[in-house]
């Protein structure tokens, strides 16, 4: 089976029409990603979060995570899935950052705490020249790695916009990657892939599109981003306008409880103010999505969770 890289990227771009990577993967894609081209070096770091974004990626279907790791990216560092740990793992991470200086993707999962000099999130330890242990904060890690990266991808809403760790009442000074970049005057390409958690297709598709641009910028321009730094490829659709219950809304047929049929707008659905292709792409291998049995809580938006609270409304 033969498939060129150009054809592969076109297939990935079919996400606009609701066809995701998980629906179009076949053996030819492996050939396209490996024939005559290097895999994208990736360093994945974790700050304040629940690891849900990593879990979502690990649940990718067609391609499965095995194929993503073996054929699409070169995952050099990931605290959850890598075999090494402790000082050895961090040492490897810094070695990779130097080896691929200016040519690796930095994926950031979780918010960055800045209060108390960032000590609310210690990501590991290193040894100095005298053999003394040095605790590395998430703040320090991003300061060290981001300027050396080719581009940074903020994976998940906590990383992209602050999310739950930065919600009202937090004492850790949690910040999004973009706010941290602004404070530290870090000028690197930043792409936000929000979601609580993001869909696997959004993460893999963004990396594929970005890496294809690196390999051939003439043929593959960077995906267009919206004002909030999100790829319109995945975040250009309004949930409400693509909802299967839209006709119920237009006819004022509103559900009174979650067990009753009808539009759930009066139960707190945030679909009208939320932009993502969830209605087309769906979740869990295309089986279902949030509005199937609950409501959209607007998890991909910059004002989540405070601006989307309460999630449910009793009418």
Swiss-Prot record:
<dbReference type="InterPro" id="IPR001821">
    <property type="entry name" value="NiFe_hydrogenase_ssu"/>
</dbReference>
<feature type="binding site">
    <location>
        <position position="158"/>
    </location>
    <ligand>
        <name>[4Fe-4S] cluster 1</name>
    </ligand>
</feature>
<comment type="subunit">
    <text>Heterodimer of a large and a small subunit.</text>
</comment>
<keyword id="KW-0004">4Fe-4S</keyword>
<feature type="binding site">
    <location>
        <position position="278"/>
    </location>
    <ligand>
        <name>[4Fe-4S] cluster 3</name>
    </ligand>
</feature>
<keyword id="KW-0732">Signal</keyword>
<dbReference type="GO" id="GO:0042597">
    <property type="term" value="C:periplasmic space"/>
</dbReference>
<dbReference type="InterPro" id="IPR019546">
    <property type="entry name" value="TAT_signal_bac_arc"/>
</dbReference>
<keyword id="KW-0408">Iron</keyword>
<feature type="binding site">
    <location>
        <position position="290"/>
    </location>
    <ligand>
        <name>[4Fe-4S] cluster 3</name>
    </ligand>
</feature>
<dbReference type="GO" id="GO:0009055">
    <property type="term" value="F:electron transfer activity"/>
</dbReference>
<feature type="binding site">
    <location>
        <position position="243"/>
    </location>
    <ligand>
        <name>[4Fe-4S] cluster 2</name>
    </ligand>
</feature>
<dbReference type="GO" id="GO:0008901">
    <property type="term" value="F:ferredoxin hydrogenase activity"/>
</dbReference>
<feature type="binding site">
    <location>
        <position position="263"/>
    </location>
    <ligand>
        <name>[4Fe-4S] cluster 2</name>
    </ligand>
</feature>
<feature type="binding site">
    <location>
        <position position="299"/>
    </location>
    <ligand>
        <name>[4Fe-4S] cluster 3</name>
    </ligand>
</feature>
<feature type="binding site">
    <location>
        <position position="296"/>
    </location>
    <ligand>
        <name>[4Fe-4S] cluster 3</name>
    </ligand>
</feature>
<dbReference type="InterPro" id="IPR027394">
    <property type="entry name" value="Cytochrome-c3_hydrogenase_C"/>
</dbReference>
<feature type="binding site">
    <location>
        <position position="50"/>
    </location>
    <ligand>
        <name>[4Fe-4S] cluster 1</name>
    </ligand>
</feature>
<feature type="binding site">
    <location>
        <position position="269"/>
    </location>
    <ligand>
        <name>[4Fe-4S] cluster 2</name>
    </ligand>
</feature>
<protein>
    <recommendedName>
        <fullName>Periplasmic [NiFeSe] hydrogenase small subunit</fullName>
        <ecNumber>1.12.99.6</ecNumber>
    </recommendedName>
</protein>
<dbReference type="GO" id="GO:0009375">
    <property type="term" value="C:ferredoxin hydrogenase complex"/>
</dbReference>
<feature type="signal peptide" description="Tat-type signal">
    <location>
        <begin position="1"/>
        <end position="32"/>
    </location>
</feature>
<dbReference type="GO" id="GO:0051539">
    <property type="term" value="F:4 iron, 4 sulfur cluster binding"/>
</dbReference>
<dbReference type="Pfam" id="PF14720">
    <property type="entry name" value="NiFe_hyd_SSU_C"/>
</dbReference>
<keyword id="KW-0411">Iron-sulfur</keyword>
<dbReference type="InterPro" id="IPR037024">
    <property type="entry name" value="NiFe_Hase_small_N_sf"/>
</dbReference>
<dbReference type="GO" id="GO:0046872">
    <property type="term" value="F:metal ion binding"/>
</dbReference>
<feature type="binding site">
    <location>
        <position position="196"/>
    </location>
    <ligand>
        <name>[4Fe-4S] cluster 1</name>
    </ligand>
</feature>
<dbReference type="InterPro" id="IPR006311">
    <property type="entry name" value="TAT_signal"/>
</dbReference>
<keyword id="KW-0560">Oxidoreductase</keyword>
<feature type="binding site">
    <location>
        <position position="53"/>
    </location>
    <ligand>
        <name>[4Fe-4S] cluster 1</name>
    </ligand>
</feature>
<dbReference type="Pfam" id="PF01058">
    <property type="entry name" value="Oxidored_q6"/>
</dbReference>
<dbReference type="GO" id="GO:0009061">
    <property type="term" value="P:anaerobic respiration"/>
</dbReference>
<keyword id="KW-0574">Periplasm</keyword>
<dbReference type="GO" id="GO:0016020">
    <property type="term" value="C:membrane"/>
</dbReference>
<dbReference type="InterPro" id="IPR053622">
    <property type="entry name" value="NiFe/NiFeSe_hyd_small_subunit"/>
</dbReference>
<dbReference type="GO" id="GO:0033748">
    <property type="term" value="F:hydrogenase (acceptor) activity"/>
</dbReference>
<dbReference type="GO" id="GO:0044569">
    <property type="term" value="C:[Ni-Fe] hydrogenase complex"/>
</dbReference>
<keyword id="KW-0479">Metal-binding</keyword>
<dbReference type="InterPro" id="IPR037148">
    <property type="entry name" value="NiFe-Hase_small_C_sf"/>
</dbReference>
<feature type="binding site">
    <location>
        <position position="240"/>
    </location>
    <ligand>
        <name>[4Fe-4S] cluster 2</name>
    </ligand>
</feature>
<dbReference type="InterPro" id="IPR006137">
    <property type="entry name" value="NADH_UbQ_OxRdtase-like_20kDa"/>
</dbReference>
């Amino acid at each position: 089976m033969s498939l060129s890289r150009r054809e592969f990227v076109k297939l990935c771009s079919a996400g606009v029409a609701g066809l995701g990577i998980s629906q179009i993967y076949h053996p030819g894609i492996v050939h396209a990603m490996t024939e005559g081209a290097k895999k994208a070096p990736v360093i994945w770091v974790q700050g304040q979060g629940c690891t849900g974004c990593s879990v979502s990626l690990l649940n990718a279907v067609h391609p499965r995570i095995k194929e993503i790791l073996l054929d699409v990216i070169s995952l050099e560092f990931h605290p959850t899935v890598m075999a090494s740990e402790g000082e050895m793992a961090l040492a490897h991470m810094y070695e990779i950052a130097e080896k691929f200086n200016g040519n690796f993707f930095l994926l950031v999962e979780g918010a960055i705490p800045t209060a108390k000099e960032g000590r609310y999130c210690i990501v590991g330890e290193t040894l100095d020249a005298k053999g003394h242990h040095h605790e590395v904060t998430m703040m320090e890690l991003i300061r060290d790695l981001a300027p050396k990266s080719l581009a940074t991808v903020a994976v998940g809403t906590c990383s992209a916009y602050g999310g739950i760790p930065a919600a009202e009442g937090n004492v850790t000074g949690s910040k999004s990657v973009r706010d941290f970049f602004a404070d530290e005057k870090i000028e690197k390409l930043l792409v936000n892939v929000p979601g609580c958690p993001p869909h696997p297709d959004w993460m893999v598709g963004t990396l594929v599109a970005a890496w294809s641009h690196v390999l051939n910028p003439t043929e593959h321009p960077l995906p267009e981003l919206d004002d909030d730094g999100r790829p319109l490829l995945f975040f250009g659709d309004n949930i409400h306008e693509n909802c299967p219950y839209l006709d119920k809304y237009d006819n004022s047929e509103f559900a009174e409880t979650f067990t009753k049929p009808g539009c759930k707008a009066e139960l707190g659905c945030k679909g009208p103010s939320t932009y993502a292709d969830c209605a087309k792409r769906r979740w869990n291998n295309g089986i279902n999505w949030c509005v199937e049995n609950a409501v959209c809580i607007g998890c991909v938006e910059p004002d989540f969770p405070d601006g989307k609270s309460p999630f449910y409304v009793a009418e």
